[in-house]
Amino acid sequence: MADQNRQIKLAAAKKKLKEFQQKTIPSTGSAGPKKKRKVKGDQTDAPADRRSPENERVDVSQELEEAGAEHVSNPASAINTDNSAPQNYPADANGDEHPLENNRPLSSTESLRQLSQQLNGLLSESSTHINGDSDPPAVNEKELETRNQELSAALDSSALTNTQLTSKLETLTKQSQELSDQLQKERKEFEQKFTKEQGAMREQLQVHIQTIGILVSEKSELQTALSYTQQAARQKAAEAEDLSSRLQASKQRVSELERTLSSVSTQQKQHERHNKELEKERDSLRLEIIRFNNVSEESRQQSSELSEQLKLRVNENSALKLELEDLRKRLEMADVMLQQFSSQSGPPSEHQQLQLLLEEKHQLENHATQLMESVAQLQAERDQYAVQMQEDGRVWKDKTEQLLSQVRLMSEERDSTAAQILELQERIMELENTAAVMSTEQEPQASSQLSGPSETELALQETLRSLQEERDALSLQFQAQVRDNEQLSRLVQEQEVKLQELERQAERASEDAQDRLRILEDVQSDKATISRALTQNRELKDQLAELQNGFVKLTNENMELTSALQSEQHVKKEIARKMGQLQEDLHNAKEQLLESSSELTSVQEQRDQYLAHLQQYSAGYQQLLAEREHLQKQFLQQTQLMDRLQHDEVQGKVQLEQSHMQLQEVQEKLSRLVRDNEELKTEVQELLNGSIMNTSHRDEGDGLESQTLPESFQKSQIAIPEDFESREEMKEFIHSVLSRVEAERDEMSRRLEEERRIHQDTRQQLTALSHDHHHHHHHEPHSTCAETDGSEGVPVEVHEALRVAMEKLQERFTKLMQEKADLKERLEELEHRCIQLSGETDTIGEYIALYQNQRAIMKQKHVEKEQYINMLAKDKEEMKTKLAELQDLVMRLVGERNEWYSRYMSAVGNRDLLNSNAEQIHPAERRMEISGVDAPAVLDMSTAMDVSSSPQSSTAEIQSQSSERPAADPISSPSLRPQEDGTARQIMQLLQEIQNPQSRPAPFLGENPCIPFFYRPDEHDEVKILVV
């Protein structure tokens, strides 16, 4: 506060100096605010300069200089400044306000006077400085009074502020002292707490150091264990990789088998479709057979009619032949007569008659030549017509076959489209069901999502639309195919109508031919035509019989196939049942494995607390290989249990060593007791030697003394080996140690019993001696004084020592027995656990061996399945090739038949021409020749076997017939028959190979040669495969 007053005063003086220098009179209103502002500014600056001693020194020196200057310049005011200086400077130097308050008991008038003197001094100093004169100028007193009043008011306000500030300063000093006291207390408490915490932290540090050492040792052990486990894990990982590769290969093989099974199922479906088509063809062939039967009946009727007509024509021919013979005879007679008439000259009338007869002969010859030409033309026309009929029949057959193939294709396409439509309908139903399920699931979400349908709904709607479009397109295709089928059926009907018309035309043509043949009554070729018609009828009958036999065989084959399929299905059902049983057995075995593993884990969880750190290190690795390493965990846990057993064995060794040490201590105590007993015995012997009256007791005592214990026990030394080669060796060592310890225990107990007995005998001797001594004391008191004192003092001490030793021995022996019993129990527990672990390892090994055996069996069956499937594929390819060969041979046989038939037709035509000039041959012989030549071309399955089995008889017949015929006959040469026999033989051989293939049963199925799969088509002709 003193600094502030001094600064205020100096600022006011400087302002006055400036005002007087400018020769202006400042207003009172402007000075007050400036002072107030300065005061405020000084108050803000005061706390910063309050505690700085350098600023105080500077201010004091400045004030002294100013005071000196004022004293020199104004001697009148020097007194006032000197009086006021001792009041202000001490406060400025010390920074205290209390001296000011104590040295200021002045009144307001004195203060005003001092202020006026100071102002006068200042004014005089300023005037001297300005004018250079020593005389002060005259000042207005009123102004000075007003100035003094203002200054007094300012001083009063400053005093008030000083008092307020001093009170605040006192309160602040008190608060600072309280805070400093609290701070010291807190420092002391903090130091105490810090020392305590430091001690605790040091203790914790030591504990942590110890735990760190333990953990480092454990870490080294765990690292070694972890290295072993990592090696085992790597081995098991390699094994797992091998197993995974094998599993992937087996999966691939299973997928391939599924593919083959699907292909087999598709092939079976195709076979079923083919069977259906064959059944349809069989029905159509039956219809054709019925039609052919009708045609054959009609042909029979026609043949009967033709035979009747032939008989009539034969009669007519015979009549004509008779007439011709008559005419020939007449001609011969006429010739004879002409010769006679030529030789004899006769009248001219006879010559004219001869000429007339010659003319008639020429006319008859011309007429015969014309008839022969017409017959030849009719035969040629007949042959052409037959060829045309055959060509037309072939063309119509080809057309009908093409139409049938088209119909089959269309029916197959219709079936496929129907199946596709059914599949699409099923898919649509499934999608509708899924859409319904999704709609039911999304109903609660619909309330929150009212803005629009979800993406899944839009996708489902799009898929439904696309499927509906596909269904519409397929329905349109189906309708178009149905229309095409209808059009094709119409075309077939039209073709059938055309065929009927052509047949009618053929019948008409045949009728025309019959009409023409009626004209040719004299022609002998009718016999050949009739025989040919008969042979054709026979061929048709043979063909019908062959067709019937073929259909019978087809039906038999179909029945055999159905029976084989049923047997295969039955065998497959049995195989599926067996596989199901095997699966159940495997499942039971897996459950047993899981149960055994769960038991192992439950047994091992009790011991897992010691391996918590190891499990933390190997937790991540075990989680990744948990599914594949159950057996690894079991083996690891077994090794851990063996390590624990070894650790327990080491602990047992330590305990055995401790027990040996204790036994040694007990032996030392026993030796001490023996020594004490010997000392007691010597003392007793001395007492007995000193006693003269009781010789008998001494002899007994000598007898008892003769039964002395050995001087010292041999220390039992048990050499514990560092390493055991096997667990059995460890067990044998522990059993031997226990037997030795038990023997030592028995020996010690025996010795203890002997000591007790000796002790009791000595006590009895001592009591007897005391009685004798007491009895002898009455007779000889003087001689036995010292001896009685000795006999009364020694037995009590000996008794107490022996009692203490016996108690100690009993306690020690009880402790040893208890420890040995505990060791025995612990060893029995360890043996029991070892036996359990060995049994569990054996069971695990058995399970592993069983699993490997089953896996090897399944692998072998899998290989055999593959071999059998490959064999079936090869058989199928061979069957295809054989069928292709059979088809080629049948086509070759048909071509050969057609060629032979055409040659036969041409030969028959040439024979008719030749037979017109040849001699008459009996019709029976000719019929025999025709039947010998005209053998059927298409053989039956059963008759062809007979033909192929007896080729020599047929060749002999052909040779005999050829020998009977003339050599110039081109038809009688059997050049075509052996070729047909060769093709028929090849066909029969192929049929035998197809019907009776080489039976190669699968080795894994036994006697039932069937595919080892179980499949069954459901309602939608879908095969559900059960892969075992």
Swiss-Prot record:
<keyword id="KW-0175">Coiled coil</keyword>
<keyword id="KW-0333">Golgi apparatus</keyword>
<feature type="compositionally biased region" description="Polar residues">
    <location>
        <begin position="74"/>
        <end position="87"/>
    </location>
</feature>
<dbReference type="GO" id="GO:0051301">
    <property type="term" value="P:cell division"/>
</dbReference>
<feature type="coiled-coil region">
    <location>
        <begin position="414"/>
        <end position="690"/>
    </location>
</feature>
<feature type="coiled-coil region">
    <location>
        <begin position="738"/>
        <end position="769"/>
    </location>
</feature>
<dbReference type="GO" id="GO:0007030">
    <property type="term" value="P:Golgi organization"/>
</dbReference>
<feature type="coiled-coil region">
    <location>
        <begin position="799"/>
        <end position="840"/>
    </location>
</feature>
<keyword id="KW-0498">Mitosis</keyword>
<dbReference type="GO" id="GO:0007420">
    <property type="term" value="P:brain development"/>
</dbReference>
<dbReference type="GO" id="GO:0015031">
    <property type="term" value="P:protein transport"/>
</dbReference>
<feature type="coiled-coil region">
    <location>
        <begin position="233"/>
        <end position="388"/>
    </location>
</feature>
<feature type="coiled-coil region">
    <location>
        <begin position="162"/>
        <end position="200"/>
    </location>
</feature>
<keyword id="KW-0653">Protein transport</keyword>
<dbReference type="GO" id="GO:0000922">
    <property type="term" value="C:spindle pole"/>
</dbReference>
<comment type="function">
    <text>Peripheral membrane component of the cis-Golgi stack that acts as a membrane skeleton that maintains the structure of the Golgi apparatus, and as a vesicle thether that facilitates vesicle fusion to the Golgi membrane. Required for normal protein transport from the endoplasmic reticulum to the Golgi apparatus and the cell membrane. Plays a central role in mitotic Golgi disassembly. Also plays a key role in spindle pole assembly and centrosome organization.</text>
</comment>
<protein>
    <recommendedName>
        <fullName>Golgin subfamily A member 2</fullName>
    </recommendedName>
</protein>
<keyword id="KW-0206">Cytoskeleton</keyword>
<feature type="region of interest" description="Disordered">
    <location>
        <begin position="944"/>
        <end position="981"/>
    </location>
</feature>
<keyword id="KW-0493">Microtubule</keyword>
<dbReference type="GO" id="GO:0001966">
    <property type="term" value="P:thigmotaxis"/>
</dbReference>
<feature type="region of interest" description="Disordered">
    <location>
        <begin position="259"/>
        <end position="280"/>
    </location>
</feature>
<comment type="similarity">
    <text>Belongs to the GOLGA2 family.</text>
</comment>
<dbReference type="GO" id="GO:0032580">
    <property type="term" value="C:Golgi cisterna membrane"/>
</dbReference>
<dbReference type="InterPro" id="IPR043937">
    <property type="entry name" value="GM130_C"/>
</dbReference>
<dbReference type="InterPro" id="IPR043976">
    <property type="entry name" value="GOLGA_cons_dom"/>
</dbReference>
<dbReference type="GO" id="GO:0033116">
    <property type="term" value="C:endoplasmic reticulum-Golgi intermediate compartment membrane"/>
</dbReference>
<dbReference type="GO" id="GO:0005874">
    <property type="term" value="C:microtubule"/>
</dbReference>
<dbReference type="Pfam" id="PF19046">
    <property type="entry name" value="GM130_C"/>
</dbReference>
<dbReference type="GO" id="GO:0000137">
    <property type="term" value="C:Golgi cis cisterna"/>
</dbReference>
<keyword id="KW-0813">Transport</keyword>
<feature type="region of interest" description="Disordered">
    <location>
        <begin position="756"/>
        <end position="791"/>
    </location>
</feature>
<dbReference type="GO" id="GO:0007519">
    <property type="term" value="P:skeletal muscle tissue development"/>
</dbReference>
<dbReference type="GO" id="GO:0005801">
    <property type="term" value="C:cis-Golgi network"/>
</dbReference>
<feature type="region of interest" description="Disordered">
    <location>
        <begin position="1"/>
        <end position="112"/>
    </location>
</feature>
<feature type="compositionally biased region" description="Basic and acidic residues">
    <location>
        <begin position="40"/>
        <end position="60"/>
    </location>
</feature>
<dbReference type="InterPro" id="IPR024858">
    <property type="entry name" value="Golgin_A"/>
</dbReference>
<keyword id="KW-0132">Cell division</keyword>
<keyword id="KW-0131">Cell cycle</keyword>
<keyword id="KW-0472">Membrane</keyword>
<dbReference type="Pfam" id="PF15070">
    <property type="entry name" value="GOLGA2L5"/>
</dbReference>
<feature type="compositionally biased region" description="Polar residues">
    <location>
        <begin position="945"/>
        <end position="964"/>
    </location>
</feature>
